[in-house]
Amino acid sequence: MPHIDIKCFPRELDEQQKAALAADITDVIIRHLNSKDSSISIALQQIQPESWQAIWDAEIEPQMEALIKKPGYSM
């Protein structure tokens, strides 16, 4: 596996841009985790800014110690 779950504010990404993002992330995961391309899955969820607090409360703040890249902001 790994499964990567990207959450971000809405972006105007066309299918080509999404494919390029997925390819770049896949390359990094293969290089650093020695994964196979076929074992990697990537989700892209666009979250409205007014809903971000819920993501912070449920996923970011409780996992702060496990994050390998911590945000430069707090809520």
Swiss-Prot record:
What is the organism field in this record? Shigella sonnei (strain Ss046)
MF annotations from Gene Ontology: intramolecular oxidoreductase activity, interconverting keto- and enol-groups
Enzymatic class: isomerase
Q: Which family does it belong to?
A: Belongs to the 4-oxalocrotonate tautomerase family. PptA subfamily.
- State the source organism's domain of life: Bacteria
Extract the Gene3D superfamilies matched here.
Macrophage Migration Inhibitory Factor
Subunit description:
Homodimer.
Subcellular location(s): the record lists: Cytoplasm
Q: Recite the UniProt keywords alphabetically.
A: Cytoplasm, Isomerase
The active site lies at P2
What is one term from the GO cellular component aspect held by the record? cytoplasm
Q: Which gene encodes it?
A: pptA
> What is the recorded name of this protein?
Tautomerase PptA
Q: What is its EC number?
A: 5.3.2.-
